[in-house]
Every structure is written in structure tokens, then in C-alpha cells.
UniProtKB/Swiss-Prot annotation:
This is Aspartyl/glutamyl-tRNA(Asn/Gln) amidotransferase subunit C. SUPFAM superfamilies: Glu-tRNAGln amidotransferase C subunit. The lineage of its organism: Bacteria, Bacillati, Actinomycetota, Actinomycetes, Kineosporiales. It comes from Kineococcus radiotolerans (strain ATCC BAA-149 / DSM 14245 / SRS30216). The keyword Ligase applies. InterPro entries: Asp/Glu-ADT_sf_sub_c, GatC. Heterotrimer of A, B and C subunits. The gene is gatC. The keyword Kinase does not apply. One of its GO terms (molecular function) is glutaminyl-tRNA synthase (glutamine-hydrolyzing) activity. Allows the formation of correctly charged Asn-tRNA(Asn) or Gln-tRNA(Gln) through the transamidation of misacylated Asp-tRNA(Asn) or Glu-tRNA(Gln) in organisms which lack either or both of asparaginyl-tRNA or glutaminyl-tRNA synthetases. The reaction takes place in the presence of glutamine and ATP through an activated phospho-Asp-tRNA(Asn) or phospho-Glu-tRNA(Gln). It catalyses: L-glutamyl-tRNA(Gln) + L-glutamine + ATP + H2O = L-glutaminyl-tRNA(Gln) + L-glutamate + ADP + phosphate + H(+); L-aspartyl-tRNA(Asn) + L-glutamine + ATP + H2O = L-asparaginyl-tRNA(Asn) + L-glutamate + ADP + phosphate + 2 H(+).
Amino acid sequence: MSAISRSEVEHLARLARIDMTDEELDRMAGQLDAVLDAVAQVASVVTDDVPATSHPVPLTNVTRPDVVRPGLTAEEALAGAPASEDGRFRVPQILGEEA
């Protein structure tokens, strides 16, 4: 049985505002199903005797100094938005009642 349906992929694509053809939806459903199967397989491994680690190889973070640079204006930031209102990003309401 599939872990993710085509309609769920369609719903996710709509939430992400990604236009997908029927062929792409079918292909993506299969690919995501394979990913979820792989995750389930990894989750099923018994690791009671394996000590917890954050990373198997010791690494040191390499950072750079913070440098102040000019950012985008509100207009520039909103220029790529699919919808805006009163100088803000307009997004679908997902919580609460209609205002």
C-alpha cells in the first residue's frame, strides 16, 4: 500500500504553490512513496545498543564574520510574492475563524 496518495501530493503542491501536471503528480507520488519506504526501513532498525551521537565524524564549524549589508526594501521583497496586501505578504488563513 502506498504511504502517500496522488491527492496528498496534489494538496502539498497546492500549499507550496507549485503547478504540477498530472504526469508530474503521478511521478512525484511514486518518488515520495519510495522515500517514505526508505525512512520507514531506517526507522525499523534496532539501535538500542548504539550510543547516541550528533555526528559520526568530529567536525569543527567554520564561520565567517558577520558583515552588515543593505537588505531588500519592502517593495522589493513583495515584488516576487504571489499576493500582498497593505505592504505585507498575503497568505491563506490556516488557523482560526474567518476575520
